[in-house]
C-alpha cells in the first residue's frame, strides 16, 4: 500500500487489544501483530515467570536481533553482487 494513506485497525497481541495506524494494508498490520504475538508466546514458553514488561522488552530485543542479522546478510549479498559487476 504505502501511498501515504493512513489505515487504522485493531489487533490483539498477547491478549491485549491495540489500535494501530499505518500506511500499510490492514492485512499487513495484522500479520505484523501476529508475528509479535507468536514471538511473545514463544519466549513465554521458555520463560514462563517473566512479567509482561520484561517479556515485551525481551521480545523487542529478539526481533531487533533477527532484523540486524537479516540486514547483515543483505549487505553481504549486495557487496557480492557489486563485486560481480
Curated annotation (Swiss-Prot):
GO CC list: cell division site; cell septum; cytosol; plasma membrane
Q: What interactions and quaternary structure are annotated?
A: Homodimer. Interacts with FtsZ.
Q: Which SUPFAM superfamilies match?
A: Cell division protein ZapA-like
- Please give the chief subcellular localization of this protein: cytoplasm
The reply on keyword Metal-binding is no
Asked whether the keyword Transmembrane helix is assigned, the reply is no
Question: Where, per UniProt, does this protein localize?
Answer: Cytoplasm
Q: Which GO biological process categories is it annotated with? A: division septum assembly; FtsZ-dependent cytokinesis; septin ring assembly
Record the organism.
Bacillus velezensis (strain DSM 23117 / BGSC 10A6 / LMG 26770 / FZB42) (Bacillus amyloliquefaciens subsp. plantarum)
State the source organism's domain of life: Bacteria
Q: What is the role of the protein in this entry?
A: Activator of cell division through the inhibition of FtsZ GTPase activity, therefore promoting FtsZ assembly into bundles of protofilaments necessary for the formation of the division Z ring. It is recruited early at mid-cell but it is not essential for cell division.
What keywords are annotated for this sequence in UniProt?
A: Cell cycle, Cell division, Coiled coil, Cytoplasm, Septation
Q: Which residues form a coiled coil?
A: 59-85
Record-stated family: Belongs to the ZapA family. Type 2 subfamily.
Q: Which InterPro entries match?
A: Bac_CellDiv_Activator, Cell_div_ZapA-like, Cell_div_ZapA-like_sf, Cell_div_ZapA_firmicutes
Name of the protein in question: Cell division protein ZapA
